């Protein structure tokens, strides 16, 4: 019997607060909860207990790993930023634009005037897509 290819794992859903912790870990890892709190101190007025709760949720979801370091744990991302961005982007397109790119581009170009550089980049993307 032929072995079936395993389906990709479902995307990991993370909250906006958890995403802030992930951004810190994507920039530098491993880090302890105290280091994460320090990195977020200028953006958030979160207590260390809040950081530990968010870290625990991320660990439970499989987004980060934890390695014992004496009396504390050091955390590293398992979820790649690129994978998370891709999942978030596709989810947005699916939810708001029924998976279609044309209405997405039309909406954003109506909301904000595209610069000449942005138009050039979009044209290049279309040309590259047509050539593939």
Model regions: which residues?
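Short, cationic-aromatic polyanion-contact patches
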Residues: 13-17, 69-88
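Short capping segments at the starts of secondary-structure elements
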Residues: 14, 26-32
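Hydrophobic residues on short alpha-helical segments
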Residues: 19-25, 105
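Short acidic, hydrophobic short linear motifs in intrinsically disordered regions
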Residues: 31-39
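Short helix-coil junctions and helix-kink-helix linkers
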Residues: 38-46
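Short, hydrophobic-biased segments on the C-terminal half of alpha helices
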Residues: 52-56
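Glycine-centered, phosphate/nucleic-acid-interacting loop/turn motifs that mediate DNA/RNA or nucleotide
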Residues: 62
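Amphipathic alpha-helical dimerization/coiled-coil segments
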Residues: 86-130
């Amino acid at each position: 019997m032929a072995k079936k290819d395993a389906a990709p794992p479902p995307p990991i859903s993370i909250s906006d607060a958890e995403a802030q912790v992930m951004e810190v870990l994507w920039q530098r890892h491993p880090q302890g909860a105290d280091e994460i709190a320090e990195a977020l101190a200028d953006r958030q007025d979160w207590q260390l207990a809040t950081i530990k709760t968010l870290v625990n949720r991320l660990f439970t979801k499989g987004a980060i790993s934890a390695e014992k370091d004496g009396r504390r744990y050091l955390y590293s991302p398992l979820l790649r930023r690129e994978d998370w961005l891709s999942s978030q982007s596709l989810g947005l397109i699916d939810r708001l634009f029924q998976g279609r790119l044309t209405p997405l581009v039309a909406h954003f170009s109506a909301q904000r005037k595209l610069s000449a550089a942005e138009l050039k980049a979009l044209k290049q993307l279309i040309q590259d897509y047509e050539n593939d």
